[in-house]
């Protein structure tokens, strides 16, 4: 079977190729991509190249994806053609470092050693494709938020008001944290305004004196570096140098 694949060739250089899908192995599965969301790593790959994301030229990419099962090997159980699934990128390919190569922006992808609840999940019919495309980034949010010992008095600072940061905030609230004790730091006022509508405070780190504004919201604590935020937890959901200029306490 031939299919159209979106390929990464280099910085600001993507293109389509017609590729041949291998025959489905006894333990494997072929699925059709229905909806894919765009990860920040995909955007960075376009802008700056894929080397930092272990993405060499001439590979497929995209990993936040919802699929429909097309064919399963004879040893694959619990799933059938027509079922909608969400792959787990780290285990859907033989090499976890190639999670970004999954092929979520192509027509079809190939899942090796397909096992339900291990490298893919069957989706509830009540969940739309667009909602399901957020499973992968929200799983990152939940993974980190669940490491915190949360109470209604917990003060949390979230660096980055994108999908990962918003997911962390939602999970913290779900576990008992108070919205008024969660503060976002981001350079995008648009993002901060959206989260303000959900009851979260925000500080724009592109503005002068943002550190003092943050301390005003979280309280101040002293450490060997001097005064800093009294937050119980700081979640880095930006991966940028500037936002992490908050002195540790």
Please state what every model-predicted region is:
Residues 148, 176, 198-249:
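Glycine-rich cofactor phosphate-binding loops and adjacent beta1-alpha1 units
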Residues 45-49:
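Short Gly/aromatic-enriched secondary-structure transition segments
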Residues 1-4:
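Extreme N-terminal starter segment of soluble prokaryotic enzymes
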Residues 39:
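Short cysteine clusters
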Residues 128-208:
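Mid-domain Rossmann-like dinucleotide-binding core that forms the NAD(H)/NADP(H) cofactor-binding site
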């Amino acid at each position: 079977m031939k299919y159209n694949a979106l390929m990464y060739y280099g910085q600001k250089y993507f293109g389509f190729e017609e590729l041949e899908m291998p025959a489905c192995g006894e333990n494997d599965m072929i699925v059709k991509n229905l909806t894919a969301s765009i990860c920040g790593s995909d955007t960075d790959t376009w802008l700056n190249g894929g080397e930092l994301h272990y993405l060499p030229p001439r590979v497929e990419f995209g990993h936040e994806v919802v699929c429909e099962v097309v064919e399963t090997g004879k040893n694959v159980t619990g799933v059938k053609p027509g079922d909608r699934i969400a792959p787990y990128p780290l285990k859907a390919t033989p090499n976890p470092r190639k999670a970004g190569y999954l092929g979520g922006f192509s027509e079809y992808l190939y899942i090796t050693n397909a096992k339900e609840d291990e490298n893919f999940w069957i989706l509830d019919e009540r969940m739309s494709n667009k909602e399901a495309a957020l499973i992968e980034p929200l799983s990152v949010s939940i993974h980190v938020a669940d490491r915190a010992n949360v109470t209604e008095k917990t003060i949390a600072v979230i660096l980055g008001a994108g999908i990962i940061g918003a997911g962390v905030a939602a999970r913290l609230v779900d576990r008992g944290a108070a919205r008024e004790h969660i503060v976002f730091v981001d350079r995008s006022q648009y993002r901060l305004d959206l989260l303000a509508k959900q009851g979260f405070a925000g500080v724009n780190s592109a503005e002068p004196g943002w550190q003092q504004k943050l301390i005003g919201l979280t309280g101040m604590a002293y450490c060997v570096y001097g005064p800093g935020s009294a937050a119980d937890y700081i979640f880095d959901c930006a991966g940028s140098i500037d936002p992490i200029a908050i002195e540790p306490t």
